[in-house]
């Protein structure tokens, strides 16, 4: 009998074991779709980004007008730009839902997969930040100035570090050029890290909503979940197209329609919506270094999740007390997102400080405590 090329060819065999014959738990819900949706987002962003880079000029005197040129003069340039800008928002919607799924169902106990995921989150955030600077509007310029300036809080080397990143004494042409270089390079590093993420995931296999061992009940990935993923792609790409076609500027900042001007500071400097929760945590601490540390820790705390897991059950499916804490965390993150977009004045400052304390308390105190309480209630 002739060997099956799908199972014998060195390259096709890898694809087969990852996407076709992969044994998958039969009961995973639609929340398990977001990994593949992130892959689609990344591919879409790389393709649209590549076409934008063909027409974009990374120079302070031309960047803003080159973006206008893309939207006005390039065939379907407006569509490519709108898909790219709003694609970033969909990327973050998917990534936050993906992380939420991981927290809820205990996926963080696969430590290698989880830690690469945390690194991926940092990489995606860095990519989005440097990308936001490229159109060289007011919010691009001042966002870059404010966020890079945070590094000056690092003792001893801070000021030197900031000037080194800027390539001068302020955000200028050198900064824009290097940010374009980073923005072009990072998505390919993300793609590489994503392959590692999958590699480690396939060492163990997926979790499932119950958190129990699913070895006795596996089904092949194709056709069951390949078609299920396809439906997810269709829904997301439809939503993205609708947003890009009908209200492309819904999630943007009006200040970015004004070319960058170092002499005029916008009244409210704020990042894109997907960074607002972390920005609110940064602003809630009066000390500069303290704020920067809180900002980094608000993301890095995810890496501590395996250490903070006290329950003898993996998933939250049968753990009502921790479920309440999880949804409190979701609500708190939404409150932080709202506060991050508000001016620095009462009552917003107070709400932000309270929400920041609650954010860290849920992770560090409530999750481990509730796990312990649930163990006791079950006489474990």
From Swiss-Prot:
Heme b b566 binds at residues 98, 197. Binds 2 heme b groups non-covalently. The chain crosses the membrane at residues 34-54, 78-99, 114-134, 179-199, 227-247, 289-309, 321-341, 348-368. GO terms for cellular component: membrane; mitochondrial inner membrane; respiratory chain complex III. Its main location: mitochondrion. GO terms for biological process: mitochondrial electron transport, ubiquinol to cytochrome c. A ubiquinone binds at residue 202. Signal peptide: none annotated. It is found in: Mitochondrion inner membrane. Its cofactor is heme b. Keywords: Electron transport, Heme, Iron, Membrane, Metal-binding, Mitochondrion, Mitochondrion inner membrane, Respiratory chain, Transmembrane, Transmembrane helix, Transport, Ubiquinone. Disulfide bonds: none annotated. InterPro entries: Cyt_b/b6_C, Cyt_b/b6_C_sf, Cyt_b/b6_N, Cytb/b6-like_sf, Cytochrome_b, Cytochrome_b_C_euk/bac, Cytochrome_b_N_euk/bac, Di-haem_cyt_TM. Gene3D superfamilies: Cytochrome Bc1 Complex, Chain C. It is a multi-pass membrane protein. Heme b b562 binds at residues 84, 183. One of its GO terms (molecular function) is metal ion binding. Pfam families: Cytochrom_B_C, Cytochrome_B. Heme 1 (or BL or b562) is low-potential and absorbs at about 562 nm, and heme 2 (or BH or b566) is high-potential and absorbs at about 566 nm. The cytochrome bc1 complex contains 3 respiratory subunits (MT-CYB, CYC1 and UQCRFS1), 2 core proteins (UQCRC1 and UQCRC2) and probably 6 low-molecular weight proteins. Belongs to the cytochrome b family. Component of the ubiquinol-cytochrome c reductase complex (complex III or cytochrome b-c1 complex) that is part of the mitochondrial respiratory chain. The b-c1 complex mediates electron transfer from ubiquinol to cytochrome c. Contributes to the generation of a proton gradient across the mitochondrial membrane that is then used for ATP synthesis. This is Cytochrome b. It comes from Xenopus laevis. The lineage of its organism: Eukaryota, Metazoa, Chordata, Craniata, Vertebrata. The gene is mt-cyb.
